[in-house]
Amino acid sequence: MTVLGGNVFPAWLFAGSKLDDFTFPQSTDTIDSKALYASDVRRVLLPDNLVTGDSVMADCRRLTEVGFPADVVSFDFTSLHGCDSLRVLMFNNIGYIGYHGISNMKSLETVEVRGVVAHIDGWFCYRLPSLRRVLFRGDVLTTGGPGVAQDCPLLEKVEFGGMVLLSWLSDAPGCPLLKKCDTKGSVVYSNNRDFLPSMSLRGDGDGEALNRKIVERVEQANKGPFGKVVGTLYDLAYNLACGFSMAGDTAIALRYLAMAVDKEKCRYGHVISDHDLDNIRNTVGYRALLPKLREQSDYLYILHNCNPYRPGSYTDGKTFTYAKASDERMKRIRQYFRLDSIAGGGSDVDKMKRVMHWLHNTISHDGSGGYPDGAAHNAIDLYEACMKQQRGLNCRGLADVLSELYMAMGWPSRFVTCQPRAYDTDGDCHVITMVWSRSMGKWLWMDPSFDTWVTDEHGVLLSIREVRERLREGKPLAINPDANWNNRNKQTKEDYLYNYMAKNLYYLSTHLHSDADIEGGPLKDGDEYISLMPVGMDGAHPGGKETNDDDWFWQAAEKTLHGKK
C-alpha cells in the first residue's frame, strides 16, 4: 500500500493492520508513535528527512525489510522493538539513533550505517541476542554513553570506519565478546581511550588539516537536515578543546576553549579539574579565560554571592496544603503498592528512606524520558506504564511519584523544581522531594533519582532550605554513602552537592497544593505554582507566582494537615 498526502502520519493509524507492503510518500516528514504497531507488514519503504516517534513499527513480527532513504533525521525509542524477523538493518545518513532505538529483535545480526551519523545515544543497541556486528562506514559526529550496547551476548565487533568527533562510549555491559571498538579514522575526543582509542597528532601541521575537516563536516551537517541534532561548533567546542589538548596542539585547543567560554558551553569547576586540559593549563591564554568563566559557572561562588531572601514579605495569607492519607486516591495508592510492608518498622524517617529506596530500585531514572505517553500523572498509572513499557522516568516524574507515596502514608510532601540562575539557557534543572518528619519536626530532603538524603557533620538529616544555607555559608555537608544513579554510578558530595545542586538551588518552584495528578493538565482549583526568588531577581520568571519570603515558602506542614482550607 502507498499512503498519499500529509506531512505527519498519525499515531496508531495502521496499528494491527493486515497490510503486507507499505510505502510512505516523500512528503511525509514525521511518523508518529506506534503508527504501524503490531501490524502484519513485511516490507516498509520510508521517506527522506524522516523523524519517527517511539515504537513506530514495534512488534511487526513478520517484517523482513525496511527500506531506509538517503537521510533519516531521527530514529527514536524502540522504533523496531519486537520485529523478530529482521536480520539486517542498513541505514544511509542518519541524524539521531535514540536510546534503545534498536532493541528486542531476536534475529537481528548486523547493523550497518553507510553514511554520516550526527549522534547516537548510549545503549542504542539493546537486548539483541543474535547481533554480531555494528558497522559505521562514515563519520560519526557525537555519541552518548557510557554503553555502546547492552545485553547482546554474541556482539563481537563495533567498527568506526570514519572520523569520530566526540565519544562518551566506555563499555558494553552484557556483551562479553566485545572488549573495545575498532577505529579506522581519527577519533578527536574519546572519554575512554582504552575502549575507543583517540588520536595523537604528529605536530607537523596535521592538526590544522584535521581541524579544517571538522569545521567543514559540522558546517555541512548544520546546513542539512541534521542541524538540530548535531549542534554548532560552539556546542562541540569544549570537548574539541580537550581532544586537541590531549593530542598536543595547544593553539587549536585554546581557540576551542575560548569559543566554549564565550558561548557559556563549559563549567568553571570542570575546567579547572579536567586532566584533559593539563597540556594547556600553564599557558597565558588559559589563565586569561578563568575570571570570565568563574562569573559564569562557579556555582558555589554564584550561590554565595546571590541576594538574600526577604522573610515576612508574603502577605496573601495562603498556606501550602497536602492530600490526606484518608483521601480515596491516597488510600488506593497505599493499598496498591502495599506501602506499609515496604516502609517496615522504626521511625518515620526510617520508613521514608525505605519507601524512597524501593522506588529508586523499581523505576529507573531516565533524564530524557519524560512522562509516558497516554499515562495519567499519578503514582499508579506512571508505575504501570513504566512496568509495561520497560522504561524509566525523569527526575520530575520520580519526585512526583515519591511525593504521592509519602502523602499516602500520611506524611505531607511536595516535589520541588530546583533551577539554575541561567535557567533560560541552561535546561538542566533537577526535581527532588521534600517530606515532613513529625519525629524531627522539620522538612527533609529526599531525592529518588539518586536515592539520596543530605546531612550535617553530625549525621542529622537536613531540609532543602538548610542545605542551601549551608552551601552559601560554607558549612559541612554529607550525603548517604550508598547514594547512586540507577545502581550504577556512585554519587559523591562534591559532584552532587557542590557542583550539581549548588547550580540548581538558585530558584525553587513548587505547587501550593500537593495531590495526585496535580500535573495532569491545567492547575486545579486552589492550586498555584510558586517560585522562591532572591531579592532583586523578581521578573526573571522561572515559573509561576514569585515570592522572596523563604519563611512562608518553607512553612511547617503541621498547620495544614487537613487538606485545603
Each model region followed by its residue ranges:
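Secondary-structure boundary elements
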Residues: C306-L393
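Low-complexity, Gly/Ser/Thr/Pro-rich intrinsically disordered linker/tail segments
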Residues: R472-K565
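Hydrophobic/aromatic-rich core segments of domains that either
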Residues: D400-K475
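Structural signature of tandem-repeat unit edges
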Residues: M1-V8, S17-T30, S39-V51, R61-S74, ...
